[in-house]
Amino acid sequence: MSAPFFFKRSGGLTLREIATLVGGEPRDGADLERRISGIGPLDRAGPNDISFLDGAKYVQQAATTVAGACLTTPRFVDALPGQVSVLTVREPYRAFVEVARTLFPDSLRPSSLFEASGAAAGAHHPGAHVHPSARLENGVTVDPGAVIGAGAEIGSGTVIGAGAAIGVKVRIGRDCAIGANATIMHALIGDRVIIHPGCAIGQDGFGYVRGPRGAHKVPQVGRVIIQDDVEIGANSAVDRGAIRDTVIGEGSKIDNMVQIAHNVSIGRHCLFAGQSGISGSTMVEDGVIMGGQAGVADHLTVGAGAMIGAKAGVFTDVLPGARWSGYPARSGKQWLREVVTLERLARESRGGRAQDDE
């Protein structure tokens, strides 16, 4: 693989240790003492790297790989050259991710620029401003240019990135990572939360009352509550509530440039892809998945386990477990039938030609 000089290596793992970690079964002749220190795709991995093979699409790459080790299923063992130390597992990619997490633990969250320059963990850079009334547990790292407001509380093991702004009375739990230039206001944040660079958390929502003299701002006096193990991608925005809280449930993962409006309630273990958005006062139940650029209108309910396709526009409630696509969004099967029908009608209107003469 390309030299991962941006990330610290853990020191490597032997194939025996990897087999124990992922429950893998070695192929006959596998060198269990081979030390693996890196990761990579089949066509880029080198003798010290581990890769994975989980589909017929990559068998051709597997035949010429020089990876030191590979995770695969019993079906594809014979597709790999004899010099590759092979471990068979049920889910190769999941096992590969577990190995990668172990080899490169520092890659899992934004790191401290201050610590990277040689400072001890838990140090406060002299260029940071921490209000005297703020309460920081031992082991909080504060990078240069960060500002921590009056009465803020931050738990041990948390990193506050360069230029980040933590507002008055904000509470942040333990082992969190707040990326560079993030702003967090009017928020209560749990443990092990990752806020990537440029996020805006807790600013007022888009609330106005229109009148003869224009739009008048509605006071936004709620909070943002982010539960444990949530991750929010770079440049995403989470507005504070107007008269109730905006809530993001435990374990939910939000991609870059996502908009969460005021009073929204998001359940546990939801996944939102980039540029998706949830309008005000909508409730998203547990386990919902939203594709990129999908949008949900205000004051709706998206049921548990529902999946919303990329670029879909949702204007009505979604039942639990539903699969919706299109604009306006409807059942994925219905949307596909309509697309096929429109294509057929267009083809017939052209006298069977595949495309217009233009």
Question: Where on the chain are the PLM-derived regions?
Answer:
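Structural signal for interior beta-strand "rungs" in well-ordered beta-sheet cores
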Residues: F52, G118-A119, A123-S331
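Terminal amphipathic alpha-helical/low-complexity segments used for targeting or macromolecular assembly
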Residues: M1-G122, P126, R192, G198-C199, ...
